[in-house]
Amino acid sequence: MKKDSRVYLAQILERIDRILEYTANGEKAFFADSRTQDAVIRNFEVIGEAAKRIPDEYRKNHPSIPWRELSGFRDILIHQYEGVSLSQIWRIVEKDLNPLREAITKVIPALDELERQISGDEEPDGG
């Protein structure tokens, strides 16, 4: 049975929140703690994997989310780990994570609508 897309979107939001929590003490603390770095990288990997599992139709209808970039960053982290710059990761945390969280939160209601259309239900209450 395929997981519901809401599960993947919830995973993305949960992992974003974890990264924000782990990095709340700022840049200096991030660069000083390899455990925090590893935790942040792992959560980015999970975000990318969850993004890959969102159906194409949903991704096409929500181009405001950088689906390809999320998946691609995951691949870089997994396959080219040595080449990953902690400065690049920090830049993403600092500049991209909150806007991504906001964008994901905004598109979740559209998933409910798409699933209603696919199932043939006209209204959320079934009437």
Model-predicted segments: where are they?
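Solvent-exposed interaction patches of small proteins and small membrane subunits
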Residues: M1-G127
